[in-house]
A protein has these predicted regions:
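Intrinsically disordered, low-complexity linear regions
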Residues: 1-105
């Protein structure tokens, strides 16, 4: 049996693009993201600080939401992801590592 493991690293800047391009309940993508903080887990989460019209807001995004957003973002960017693969997320400094493990053959 052969196992393939891939790691997709989402930098802090790329995470901003994720939240501006993939819909997330409770977050308006038109808001200007001022800060993204990766909170180490387990499981990891993200705190988004944003502002619009003079008002500031902070939103905590849990790991199950992050996984859904990352899969949607990869689809949008045409990054292939096997459906049946094991997918995990972990913090890597101020970035997130999206790991995909699948069994081949």
């Amino acid at each position: 049996m052969i196992t393939e493991i891939r790691h997709i690293i989402f930098s802090n800047d790329e995470l901003k693009l994720v939240f501006q391009s993939v819909p997330l309940e409770g977050f308006d993508p038109a808001r200007r993201i001022t800060r993204i903080q990766v909170v180490e887990g387990p499981p990891p989460s993200i705190r988004i600080q944003s502002e619009a019209g003079g008002g500031r807001a902070e939103l905590e995004v849990e790991s199950y939401q992050l996984a859904r957003l990352m899969v949607a973002y990869c689809r949008e960017k045409k990054i292939p992801l096997p459906k049946d693969a094991l997918k995990t997320i972990h913090a890597q400094g101020d970035a997130l590592c999206f790991s995909i493990m699948s069994t081949l053959g």
